[in-house]
Amino acid sequence: MANNKSAKKRIEIAERNRLRNRTYKSSMRTLMKRCFAACDAYSATPGDEAKASVQTSMRAAFSKIDKAVKVGVLHRNNGANQKSRLSAAVRKVLEPAS
């Protein structure tokens, strides 16, 4: 355990940051799963409503990823990689293979 005041403060700050990081990552993963689920739903039954759902969920996931990068929860390359995964999945569903 910490013996001096600054070390105790660092422990408190690290715990606070850990909880913040955990909530950001959890909500980001949830939004990504919703986007992938919306893509699956659209591929099963294409329609305007399903397409709007895919685009809305992708927009929400992108926003959360960008905020996580801005706050420092994710590295910018990791954020770009996650956004690329989402974009590829959405593109695969919305644009039929030619």
Swiss-Prot record:
Q: Which UniProt keywords apply?
A: Ribonucleoprotein, Ribosomal protein, RNA-binding, rRNA-binding
Q: Does the keyword RNA-binding apply?
A: yes
Q: Name one GO molecular function term.
A: small ribosomal subunit rRNA binding
Q: Where is the signal peptide?
A: none
Keyword Plastid, does the record have it?
no
Q: Which InterPro entries match?
A: Ribosomal_bS20, Ribosomal_bS20_sf
Gene Ontology cellular-component terms for this entry are: cytosol; small ribosomal subunit
The alphabetized list of GO BP terms reads: translation
Could you tell me what this protein does? Binds directly to 16S ribosomal RNA.
Q: Report the sequence similarity comment from the record.
A: Belongs to the bacterial ribosomal protein bS20 family.
Would you tell me the protein name for this molecule? Small ribosomal subunit protein bS20
Q: Name its species.
A: Synechococcus sp. (strain CC9605)
Q: Which gene encodes it?
A: rpsT
